[in-house]
C-alpha cells in the first residue's frame, strides 16, 4: 500500500479512492479562460487540475486561479526552479517537476525549502521524452525508473518525503513495465498515465490498455488520460474507466452492436440514456438492445434493460419483463426503476 498524502483537501494514496486528474490547455496568464476551463473540468468530475507555469506572469496568475478554483491546482514546472517557488507562494497545492530538466541539487533544495514551508507535495514526473543524458545508455524502463528514483533520493536527502511519482512513456508496454517496476521499489503514491497518447481514439485505446491493466493490478493512486484536444474528454474517459473496473460508482451502459433485426437506433438511444443518467452515482447497469430476440438474455447482467419493439420499448428489470412502453414514456420509467434499484 502506498503512503497517504494531502493535496490541499484531497487525499491520495493509502486506502483512498483513485483520483481523476486533468490539465488545462489555456494560456495560464488568461485567468478568465483558465478558470472557465477548470470549472468545466470540475463539472465533468475532475478532482485535481494541473496548470502549466512556463513564465513568471503565469506563476503570478496562479494567485487568483488557486483562490477561485473549485479543486486543488498543481503547477507544472520545467527548467526554472524559481517558477516552482513562485507557484507555491501563489497558492499551488502541489508542484510537478521533471528530473530531466529542473537543474542541480541546490536548485531542488530551494524548491524543497518553500514546499516544506507551505506543506506542498512535489511530484517527480519522469517521462520517456526527457531522460537525463547520464541515464540514456540504460534500457528505457530502467532509465525511466532510475530518473525518478534519483530525484526522489535527492528530495529525501533534504528530509522531504511529501512525494508523488510518475514514470510515463508514450508506449503502452513501456508504461506498464515501468510502473510495475517502480511500484515494487517505493511506497510513494503513483500518478499513472500514458504520456503523449495522441488524438482521441488512440489516446483512449492506449490509456485504457495501460491504465486498465495497472489499476486491475492495484497500481495507481491518481490518473490522467492524456488526449490531444478538449481536456474535458480526459475526465469523462477516466471516470468511465474507473466505473468499468468497479473502482467508482456510476451507470454502465450495455448496448448491442446492432444487426438486421434492430428496430431502434441503438447508438442514439444508448447515448441519450447515458447522458441523461451520467450523474447517478450508483453501480447500475442499463442495457439498450435493438430487438427482443436476445434482449433479455444479452442484458441479463443488467439491472434494467430496454429492447426495441414496434413503436416503443420492452422494459425488463432484473431479467424479468415488466411491460411495453412508448418512446416518450421511457425516461420516466427508467428513472422510476433506477430509484427502485437504489432502494432495494
UniProtKB/Swiss-Prot annotation:
Any single GO BP term: terpenoid biosynthetic process
Details of cofactor binding: Binds 1 [4Fe-4S] cluster.
Keyword Iron on entry: yes
Domain of life from the UniProt record: Bacteria
E.C. number: 1.17.7.3
Enzymatic reactions: (2E)-4-hydroxy-3-methylbut-2-enyl diphosphate + oxidized [flavodoxin] + H2O + 2 H(+) = 2-C-methyl-D-erythritol 2,4-cyclic diphosphate + reduced [flavodoxin]
InterPro entries: Dihydropteroate_synth-like_sf (IPR011005), IspG_bac (IPR016425), IspG_bac-typ (IPR004588), NO2/SO3_Rdtase_4Fe4S_sf (IPR045854)
Protein name as it appears in the record: 4-hydroxy-3-methylbut-2-en-1-yl diphosphate synthase (flavodoxin)
Species: Thermosipho africanus (strain TCF52B)
